[in-house]
Regions:
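Conserved ABC ATPase signature
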Residues: 10-14, 18
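Charged, flexible cofactor/metal-binding loops and thiol motifs
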Residues: 4, 94-165
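ABC-family P-loop ATPase nucleotide-binding domains
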Residues: 1-7
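Catalytic Walker B motif of ABC-type/P-loop ATPase nucleotide-binding domains
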Residues: 35-38
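ABC ATPase nucleotide-binding domain signature region
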Residues: 19-22, 49
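A short, proline-enriched helix->beta-strand linker immediately N-terminal to the Walker B motif
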Residues: 29-33, 62
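P-loop NTP-binding/switch modules centered on Walker-like glycine-rich loops
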Residues: 43-118
Protein backbone atom coordinates (compact mmCIF):
# COMPACT_ATOMS: atom_id res chain seq x y z
CA UNK A 1 0.00 0.00 0.00
CA UNK A 2 1.12 3.53 -0.71
CA UNK A 3 0.20 6.32 1.71
CA UNK A 4 -2.62 7.64 -0.48
CA UNK A 5 -4.45 4.30 -0.44
CA UNK A 6 -4.01 3.91 3.31
CA UNK A 7 -5.96 7.11 3.92
CA UNK A 8 -9.11 5.56 2.47
CA UNK A 9 -8.98 2.44 4.67
CA UNK A 10 -10.35 1.62 8.08
CA UNK A 11 -7.83 0.29 10.63
CA UNK A 12 -9.19 -3.28 10.36
CA UNK A 13 -8.48 -3.21 6.60
CA UNK A 14 -4.73 -2.74 7.13
CA UNK A 15 -2.27 -5.59 7.51
CA UNK A 16 -0.55 -5.91 10.89
CA UNK A 17 2.67 -4.50 9.49
CA UNK A 18 0.97 -1.57 7.78
CA UNK A 19 -1.03 -0.76 10.93
CA UNK A 20 2.24 -0.68 12.89
CA UNK A 21 3.79 1.69 10.34
CA UNK A 22 0.78 4.02 10.49
CA UNK A 23 0.96 4.04 14.30
CA UNK A 24 4.69 4.86 14.21
CA UNK A 25 4.06 7.65 11.70
CA UNK A 26 1.42 9.14 13.99
CA UNK A 27 3.77 8.94 16.97
CA UNK A 28 6.60 10.50 14.93
CA UNK A 29 4.45 13.57 14.39
CA UNK A 30 4.43 14.18 18.14
CA UNK A 31 8.21 14.02 18.68
CA UNK A 32 7.48 11.97 21.78
CA UNK A 33 10.10 11.56 24.51
CA UNK A 34 8.30 8.53 25.95
CA UNK A 35 6.71 5.77 23.89
CA UNK A 36 4.44 3.19 25.48
CA UNK A 37 3.70 0.28 23.17
CA UNK A 38 1.35 -2.55 24.16
CA UNK A 39 2.21 -5.72 22.22
CA UNK A 40 3.62 -3.67 19.30
CA UNK A 41 4.95 -6.70 17.44
CA UNK A 42 1.93 -8.95 17.91
CA UNK A 43 1.24 -10.69 14.61
CA UNK A 44 4.63 -9.86 13.10
CA UNK A 45 7.19 -12.48 12.14
CA UNK A 46 10.82 -12.25 13.29
CA UNK A 47 11.81 -10.14 10.28
CA UNK A 48 8.88 -7.79 10.91
CA UNK A 49 9.84 -7.48 14.59
CA UNK A 50 13.42 -6.62 13.66
CA UNK A 51 12.22 -3.99 11.17
CA UNK A 52 9.83 -2.55 13.75
CA UNK A 53 12.54 -2.07 16.38
CA UNK A 54 15.04 -0.70 13.84
CA UNK A 55 12.45 1.82 12.65
CA UNK A 56 11.50 2.75 16.22
CA UNK A 57 15.15 3.35 17.14
CA UNK A 58 15.83 5.39 13.99
CA UNK A 59 12.79 7.66 14.44
CA UNK A 60 13.04 7.97 18.23
CA UNK A 61 16.74 7.56 19.09
CA UNK A 62 16.51 9.54 22.33
CA UNK A 63 13.01 8.58 23.50
CA UNK A 64 12.41 6.23 26.41
CA UNK A 65 10.49 3.19 25.26
CA UNK A 66 8.18 1.08 27.45
CA UNK A 67 7.30 -2.14 25.65
CA UNK A 68 4.51 -4.30 27.09
CA UNK A 69 4.80 -7.86 25.82
CA UNK A 70 4.26 -11.53 26.57
CA UNK A 71 6.93 -12.47 24.00
CA UNK A 72 10.25 -13.34 25.65
CA UNK A 73 12.14 -12.68 22.39
CA UNK A 74 10.76 -9.12 22.36
CA UNK A 75 11.58 -8.61 26.05
CA UNK A 76 15.12 -9.83 25.35
CA UNK A 77 15.66 -6.82 23.03
CA UNK A 78 15.12 -4.39 25.92
CA UNK A 79 17.57 -3.04 28.50
CA UNK A 80 15.46 -3.77 31.57
CA UNK A 81 12.50 -6.03 32.27
CA UNK A 82 9.67 -5.97 34.81
CA UNK A 83 7.74 -9.21 35.32
CA UNK A 84 4.10 -8.81 36.40
CA UNK A 85 1.50 -11.36 37.45
CA UNK A 86 -2.03 -10.32 38.26
CA UNK A 87 -0.96 -6.69 38.09
CA UNK A 88 1.68 -7.15 40.79
CA UNK A 89 5.42 -6.68 40.34
CA UNK A 90 7.27 -9.94 40.85
CA UNK A 91 10.75 -9.30 39.47
CA UNK A 92 12.75 -6.53 37.81
CA UNK A 93 16.31 -5.93 36.67
CA UNK A 94 18.46 -5.92 33.58
CA UNK A 95 17.33 -8.25 30.84
CA UNK A 96 20.51 -10.33 31.11
CA UNK A 97 20.11 -10.72 34.88
CA UNK A 98 16.38 -11.51 34.97
CA UNK A 99 16.29 -13.76 31.90
CA UNK A 100 19.63 -15.35 32.77
CA UNK A 101 19.08 -16.01 36.47
CA UNK A 102 15.43 -15.52 37.41
CA UNK A 103 14.59 -15.69 41.09
CA UNK A 104 10.78 -15.75 41.29
CA UNK A 105 9.06 -19.07 40.46
CA UNK A 106 6.68 -17.26 38.08
CA UNK A 107 9.56 -15.84 36.04
CA UNK A 108 11.16 -19.29 35.97
CA UNK A 109 7.87 -20.79 34.75
CA UNK A 110 7.53 -18.16 32.01
CA UNK A 111 11.01 -18.86 30.74
CA UNK A 112 10.48 -22.63 30.89
CA UNK A 113 7.20 -22.51 28.94
CA UNK A 114 7.73 -23.55 25.35
CA UNK A 115 5.03 -23.21 22.71
CA UNK A 116 6.20 -26.51 21.20
CA UNK A 117 5.27 -28.23 24.48
CA UNK A 118 1.85 -26.58 24.58
CA UNK A 119 0.82 -23.63 26.68
CA UNK A 120 -0.79 -24.21 30.05
CA UNK A 121 -3.99 -22.33 30.71
CA UNK A 122 -3.62 -19.05 32.54
CA UNK A 123 -4.05 -19.38 36.28
CA UNK A 124 -7.15 -18.03 37.92
CA UNK A 125 -5.83 -14.96 39.67
CA UNK A 126 -7.25 -14.21 43.08
CA UNK A 127 -8.51 -10.66 43.33
CA UNK A 128 -8.73 -8.72 46.56
CA UNK A 129 -6.67 -11.27 48.48
CA UNK A 130 -3.19 -10.68 49.82
CA UNK A 131 -0.41 -13.06 48.96
CA UNK A 132 1.21 -14.13 45.75
CA UNK A 133 -1.00 -14.17 42.63
CA UNK A 134 1.03 -17.16 41.35
CA UNK A 135 0.33 -19.23 44.50
CA UNK A 136 -1.96 -21.81 42.85
CA UNK A 137 0.62 -22.84 40.24
CA UNK A 138 3.86 -22.28 42.12
CA UNK A 139 5.98 -25.37 42.83
CA UNK A 140 7.51 -23.61 45.84
CA UNK A 141 4.34 -22.24 47.47
CA UNK A 142 3.47 -22.80 51.09
CA UNK A 143 0.89 -21.47 53.55
CA UNK A 144 2.78 -18.17 53.89
CA UNK A 145 2.32 -17.53 50.17
CA UNK A 146 -1.45 -17.88 50.35
CA UNK A 147 -2.14 -14.95 52.67
CA UNK A 148 1.21 -13.41 53.54
CA UNK A 149 2.65 -10.23 52.14
CA UNK A 150 5.23 -10.63 49.43
CA UNK A 151 8.63 -9.36 50.55
CA UNK A 152 11.09 -7.48 48.36
CA UNK A 153 14.42 -9.25 47.84
CA UNK A 154 17.54 -8.22 45.91
CA UNK A 155 20.84 -9.74 44.90
CA UNK A 156 22.29 -6.42 43.72
CA UNK A 157 21.27 -6.97 40.09
CA UNK A 158 17.68 -8.15 40.33
CA UNK A 159 14.81 -7.16 42.61
CA UNK A 160 11.97 -9.60 43.14
CA UNK A 161 8.89 -9.86 45.32
CA UNK A 162 8.22 -13.26 46.77
CA UNK A 163 6.79 -14.94 49.86
CA UNK A 164 10.01 -16.92 50.24
CA UNK A 165 13.59 -16.24 49.15
Amino acid sequence: DVPETVLDKYPFQLSGGMAQRVTIALAACSRARLLIADEPTNGLDEAGRAQFFALLDSIFPDAAKLIITHDISVAARCDRVLVLCGGRMLETGTVDAVLGTPHHPYTKALLAAQVANGMQPSPVLREGVSGCPFYARCSESDEACLNGAMQKHTDGKIEWWCCHA
